[in-house]
Design a protein with these regions (language model features):
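Alpha-helical segment of the N-proximal tetratricopeptide repeat
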Residues: 3-32
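Residue signature of alpha-solenoid helical repeat architecture, marking inter-repeat boundaries
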Residues: 1-2, 38, 87
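"A position-specific structural signal for the A-helix of alpha-solenoid helical repeats
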Residues: 9, 46, 88-91, 95, ...
Length: 149
């Protein structure tokens, strides 16, 4: 296994243990060491999720966009990670929609929602497969309802 892959998997471990700053650094190190293309979109996605967890939404947005771009370059294959099944780009779009909602940019959130329409990506919750589109649609609707009261 290459050094860059070892660093990537170490970063995943740090991420799973909620050591977000350390994970970001380790993910960036793996990229600097020439991480294989097939992991680059996941690496950017994980960095974005770390920033989201730290409530650094502008930084997260940058890395979600990089994940989408890297996925389009590498073929954006369907991944299976625990209860999540689907393309990295779909997960990144869901993240971007959540950022738009935090910023109260509802038109942007709705536009992003449309990009998830028809996707095969889903999250399995209590044995039920819920599409990324349905998750995003529910979140957009809920936030709009809360703020309209």
């Amino acid at each position: 296994m290459k050094t860059s892959e070892v660093k990537f998997f170490e970063a995943v471990k740090l991420f799973n243990e909620d050591f977000y700053w350390d994970a970001i650094e380790a993910f960036q190190d793996s990229l600097s060491d020439g991480l294989e293309d097939r992991y680059v979109d996941d690496c950017f996605l994980n960095i974005a999720v770390c920033y989201m967890s730290l409530k650094l939404f502008n930084e997260a947005e940058v890395y979600f966009l990089r994940a989408i771009d890297a996925g389009s370059t590498s073929g954006d294959q369907i991944d299976f990670e625990g209860p999540i099944f689907g393309k990295t780009s779909d997960r990144a779009y869901l993240g971007l929609a959540r950022i738009a909602l935090v910023k109260k940019e509802f038109a942007d959130a709705t536009n992003i929602l449309e990009k998830l329409k028809g996707t095969e990506s889903y999250i399995e919750i209590n044995g039920e497969k819920i599409s990324m589109y349905d998750i995003c649609n529910e979140e957009v609707t809920r936030v709009k309802d809360i703020l309209s009261k």
